[in-house]
């Protein structure tokens, strides 16, 4: 299939995903508002209070019900976006049973992580008084750092098989590249993504002693070694520029602002909805609504910051490898294999994309000179 036809398919794929994003956003807002105004949250809170007088148990039971209900409510949209659409565009290798198993794993993970975090969050709300937004922000900061460290060793293996890379030549090249940016890596791993998808990916994942290089088999099988090297050089550019720390700092700042806005929204809404305290679990949909709306408003700013770091990482990749041709080839292959729109509408890119468009990255690389 020639590039023009592939890009036509990519634009259709992008357009459908953009519509799906709008549908999911409206659907989420509708569910939260309905849960509040139809008093579903009040009924659920009354039920959990009848089970125990312990507030930790109240929040835990409420959290389990909400997590399971959310998964069920979004199952049709998840099926359409993650299974049907991927198969329709020839991107998925995953059977329905395997997809359903991944959904169950995702549910179990949300329960295992989300419910304890919700319990600790409401403990902070009960104890922190007017400084609750600072306490909650510190909680989310700690959670983000821990998850960044544990992701490659605990979370990723739940969904993908990981094994040490057998290509010794490539392993040595990537390890040497990591040493050049001052990164110590535990190892280089091959990730069996082809069981689920035809898309290619790579990551420089983990923190400290969990940091490792991860390469999808779909990347290893389709890309030349110099192309893989430049893709990983981009990821290592993030490390070289301290982007993990900067992204955590940026995320912490926006989280604090979001939680402060949510605190104001909670106090404004509680009086109108009849809730007495911010730690009333029945008011959770109001808290979620405030955070969700802030997230939507802040998304373009967050994406702009992310895109600025991606440009820096691209520059680092070209400086580290001095291989502009491999960079351009890799970008074009990623667009083709992942069915990415090379030139999304500028408004769509500004609002929804955390990476610059591949066409702009390629054009920039074509103009790049090492000095």
Ranges and model annotations:
Residues 286-290:
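Alpha-helical transmembrane segments
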